[in-house]
Amino acid sequence: MCIRDRAVAALAYGTEEIPRVSKIVGPGNIFVATAKKLLYGTVDIDMFAGPSEILVFADETANPVYLAADLMSQAEHDKLASAIMITTSMDIAVRTQAEIERQSAYLSRKDIIDYSMTNYGAIIVSEDKDYAIELANKLAPEHMEVVAENPTEYIGKIDNVGSLFLGQYSPEPLGDYYAGPNHVLPTSGTARFFSPLGVDSFVKRSSYICYTKDALLDAADDIILIAEREKLTAHANSIKVRKEG
């Protein structure tokens, strides 16, 4: 167990010097993610984070030099990272693959890039733009770039994505380091039901109920009926004693 895993446990249970916390958030390697998953329930967590991933949609107007660079920016994270591109143009696909081979030669994490691109990467060619939308919503990627002539037309069509980057001058590393939105994002398809970390992640709600006597009496028969159907007679009795009193 590495120091970071121990830190997760220390925060969840508390120590003589560290007070117990209610929620643990933030990215980490597979060991940190596993520690957070094991401790979910003891504390709340932001999400179950897996390896980094990117889906790029590119039409015939995209620049293969940029596309290759952006795919590798995620592939370099680790050997389990996923970098997938879908394009409407066979020419763009071929040129992007050539650029990956050219650019990776001078990158420091070439071995990791080569492994992740070979095992978890893909370049898909489809003339059907709707297929790209369908694929995106099924994969629910952590990051997605739309590099197309009119990228904003895809807003509202792609629902399941952690962070959406629009246009050739909005590369994924912009979101990692500078743009502003939190880049702790759902991975492994969990963008179907998880959202990026945000201020609302640190807010919890409670319910408040206050009935008058008349309001409770109006609802009493309905509550008693439901409780008795469930054979929870003490529930029903809690209402009956007030109705009778």
Residue ranges and their predicted role:
Residues 5, 18-22, 26-27, 42-44, ...:
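Short coil/turn connectors at secondary-structure junctions
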Residues 7, 128-131, 153-154:
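Short acidic active-site motifs
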Residues 12, 24-27, 48, 57-59, ...:
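Short beta-strand segments
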Residues 30-131:
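ALDH superfamily catalytic-core signature
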